[in-house]
């Protein structure tokens, strides 16, 4: 099939259609190998398509030359780009050149960026200039990377910075309280924990938030139109905020990506983002450059109930080392931030210097987070998965802690002394067959817990099957001290038990 399509294109038989079909035919390795064999001894025929009078032939040929990954095509592609008169074709040459060594041509491509920046934008050329500028940026970045800014915001400033901590929606008060204890002003907000402060050092210490988004001064809400949104953002305090948090202005642009959260379908979202990004580059005089592959900041555009946009800033320049120990994980691993939340919620029921057991330890996250908040005497982790236990050992070493991990089933585990606490993330299931097995696990769990816990000991459990825990804990002689809903969607609760008196 590849040979027939190629030979027909060479003979001038439906050249445009055959080259287009070739692009589809070479998406798998076999098709690509067939085309490579046809072209490698006759490069001139392929490059000859770039001289066609049909712009779509030139476009398809350029893209095929990029996919073939033959270094001999670099010069013809650059020459083709230089002389290409059709705006909609120009970005195809640039796309084709990605992956090739184009270092010697960088001055030329950077000069072209300057030319496009100075070009008057009209409704007719806007789309194609934006496409070419985006392709040029990606090509240049793929060759030399970006000049990254260093976050220097962990210190006291004269002006306040406002932001939002993203945390568990049902337990936001836990994070609010920690902020207040750090002396940070907490502001009313429903979608997270909003703060205003002149010192961001608390971001390194509070462990119960998953993300931080910054409020952009002068740009809280804007019209849901790409050009208007870009103009408002460019005229806001965004650049001042970025400079303040990164040690001042150094002449280097910030590279950004856009995340649009909206009811628009994917096609309309993509169109909006492209128009917004291109306009923002122009309005900011390319001190903000859109890059899908390598970026430092994210502009998060969120459609609100009034069909306008709230714009927030996410910084990838912040090195979040709170969970740097989490180097190994498995599919069922609980996220460290969730473990940290469970610990914070249960902390008042934990005892310092306790003997602690996690019978379903996974990669050790629960025990590691507990130790960070409330020091244990000795901690043991059990799991039937050898892979999980190996991961737990690596994570615990990375955390600078000591935990005794054993690749063993909790229900056959024996130990010479009793534990003060069982702290665990219980197994869970998503289908009825495994649910029957889970019922048996919960029944056996509480029976075995009686063998391993002191009479004053407590069970602190994260469960997606709280009804099973209620049933079998009562049968085994436990009473519930506390239940905290973590996720209504997943029926997940933090549950704390102790022996009936």
Residues covered by each model-derived region:
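Interaction modules related to DNA damage response and DNA replication/repair
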Residues: 286-297
């Amino acid at each position: 099939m590849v040979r027939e399509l190629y030979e027909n294109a060479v003979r001038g038989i439906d050249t445009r259609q055959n080259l287009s079909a070739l692009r589809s035919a070479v998406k798998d390795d076999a098709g690509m190998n067939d085309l490579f064999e046809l072209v490698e001894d006759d490069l001139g025929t392929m490059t000859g398509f770039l001289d066609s009078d049909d712009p779509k032939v030139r476009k398809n040929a350029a893209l095929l030359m990029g996919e073939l990954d033959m270094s001999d095509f670099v010069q013809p592609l650059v020459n083709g780009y230089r002389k290409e008169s059709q705006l909609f074709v120009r970005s195809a040459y640039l796309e084709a050149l990605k992956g090739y060594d184009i270092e010697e041509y960088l001055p030329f491509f950077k000069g072209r960026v300057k030319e496009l920046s100075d070009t008057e934008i009209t409704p007719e050329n806007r789309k194609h200039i934006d496409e070419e500028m985006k392709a040029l940026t990606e090509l240049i970045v793929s060759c030399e990377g970006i000049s990254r800014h260093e976050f220097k915001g962990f210190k006291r400033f004269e002006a306040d910075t406002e932001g939002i901590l993203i945390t568990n929606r049902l337990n936001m008060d836990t994070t609010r309280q920690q902020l207040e204890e750090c002396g940070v002003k907490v502001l009313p907000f429903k979608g997270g924990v909003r703060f205003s402060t002149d010192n961001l050092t608390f971001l390194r210490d509070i462990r119960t938030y998953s993300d931080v988004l910054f409020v952009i001064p002068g740009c809280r809400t804007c019209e849901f139109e790409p050009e208007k949104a870009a103009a408002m953002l460019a005229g806001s305090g965004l650049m001042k905020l970025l400079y303040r948090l990164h040690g001042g202005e150094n002449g280097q642009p910030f590279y950004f990506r856009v995340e649009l959260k909206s009811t628009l379908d994917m096609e309309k979202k993509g169109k909006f983002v492209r128009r917004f990004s291109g306009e923002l580059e122009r309005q900011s005089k390319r001190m903000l450059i859109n890059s899908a592959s390598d970026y430092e900041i994210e502009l998060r555009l969120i459609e609100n109930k009034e069909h306008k946009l709230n714009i927030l800033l996410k910084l990838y320049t912040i090195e979040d080392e709170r969970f740097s120990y989490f180097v190994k994980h498995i599919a069922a691993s609980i996220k460290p931030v969730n473990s940290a939340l469970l610990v914070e919620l249960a902390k008042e029921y934990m005892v310092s210097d306790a003997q602690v057991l996690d019978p379903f330890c996974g990669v050790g996250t629960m025990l590691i987070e507990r130790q960070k908040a409330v020091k244990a005497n000795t901690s043991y982790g059990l799991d039937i998965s050898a892979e999980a236990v190996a991961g737990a050992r690596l994570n615990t070493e990375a955390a600078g802690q000591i935990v005794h991990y054993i690749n063993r089933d909790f229900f056959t585990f024996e130990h010479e002394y009793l534990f003060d606490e069982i702290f665990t993330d219980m197994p869970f299931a998503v289908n009825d067959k495994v649910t029957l097995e889970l019922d048996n696990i919960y029944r056996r769990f509480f029976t075995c817990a009686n063998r391993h816990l002191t009479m004053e000991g407590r069970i602190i459990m994260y469960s997606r099957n709280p009804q099973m825990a209620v049933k079998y804990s009562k049968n085994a002689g436990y009473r519930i001290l506390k239940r905290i809903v973590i996720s209504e969607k997943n029926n997940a609760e933090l549950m704390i038990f102790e022996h009936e008196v």
